[in-house]
Design a protein with these regions (language model features):
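Residues at the starts of beta-strands that form the adenosine-phosphate
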Residues: 11, 128, 151-152, 180
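Rossmann-like adenosine-cofactor binding region
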Residues: 179-254
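Short helix-loop-beta connector
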Residues: 122-128, 225-227
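Adenosine-phosphate binding glycine-rich loop
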Residues: 228-230, 234-290
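NAD(P)-binding Rossmann-fold cofactor-contacting core
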Residues: 148-177
Length: 290
């Protein structure tokens, strides 16, 4: 617990519902303490009904900014003054920066995923990846990957409302980037096999593998995976999902969602404080090296 908090400290929030399970306050405050910077990070239970008032409160109280999570990532965009290209493309914001009363919306989820790959020595720039999922995390990853220079992205999802939304995002990316992006029904297993065979990275950005779907995997046939494929899962609890277990048995390099969570948080800290987050220190303090 920091004992030097005074009137010069600035508050950074997290607006989501539910929120009590989040690891972000522990991670962020661990970093601020280590860096000895005058910031405190607190979680606030804010649903969509309370969001407009919460943004007014952020402005009125002069918060340095706020993280934004479900169910507010899309709705919050209409209350902000500026949006980054990634937010405009994805339609979702997970980070607000308050700069002298001007609120700018960022999305660091995709940044965190791409940085995780880079730190793990995985080069996907100019190459192809396959991603399963079409929700907020998947959309952020697809958008950032396209903006960063990934050549081709194959998206697989069930034909639900998210499918239609990600089709619209894919259309924007095809029109505004050099990346070829397309969406296919997840039930088409032969097409999924073909796209994975042509990809250097496979990403699971669905909830399959975490509670209440723990122990399940969208990939059930191990022969769809090869040893030189990098398999990533946005889930970090459990640390090793069924998909990652299958991939590891096939000799694949595997990455869980901890790296994405840490690096997206580091990107937020850079936005809010201008400082580089001591990621290795955080991993040690929070037991992520175990």
């Amino acid at each position: 617990m920091r004992d030097n908090i005074d009137g010069h400290f600035l508050l950074i929030g997290l607006m989501a519902y539910p929120i009590r399970h989040s690891l972000s306050p522990q991670m962020q405050n661990t970093i601020y303490s280590k860096l000895d910077v005058p910031y405190v990070y607190l979680a606030f239970e804010v649903d969509q009904e309370k969001l407009p008032d919460a943004i007014k409160g952020l402005r009125a109280l002069g918060l340095r900014g706020s993280a934004v999570s479900m169910p507010n990532k899309q709705l919050v965009c209409q209350y902000l003054d500026k949006l980054t290209p990634a937010v405009k493309m994805s339609g979702a914001c997970n980070t607000i920066s308050n700069d002298n009363g001007v609120l700018t919306g960022y999305n660091t989820d995709g940044i965190g995923y791409m940085r995780m790959l880079k730190e793990a020595g995985v080069d996907v720039i100019g190459k192809k990846m396959t991603i399963m999922g079409a929700g907020g995390a998947a959309t952020a990853i697809v958008v950032q990957a396209a903006l960063d220079g990934v050549k081709e992205i194959a998206i697989f999802n069930q034909k639900d409302e998210c499918y239609q939304k990600i089709e619209a995002v894919a259309k924007k990316l095809n029109q505004n980037t050099q990346c070829k992006v397309y969406v296919t029904d997840l039930d088409d297993k032969e097409q999924l096999r073909k796209e994975i065979a042509e990809s250097v990275v496979l990403c699971n950005a669905t909830g399959v593998g975490m509670k209440p779907l723990e122990g399940q995997s969208l990939i059930t046939d191990p022969t769809m995976l090869r040893a030189d494929l990098v398999v990533t899962d946005c889930i970090y609890s459990p640390r090793k999902t069924k998909l990652l277990e299958i991939a590891e048995q096939q000799g694949c390099k595997i990455l869980n969602g901890i790296g994405m969570m840490l690096w997206q948080g580091a990107a937020q800290i850079k936005i809010w404080t201008g400082e580089e987050a001591p990621i290795e220190y955080v991993k040690e303090k929070m037991g992520f090296n175990d």
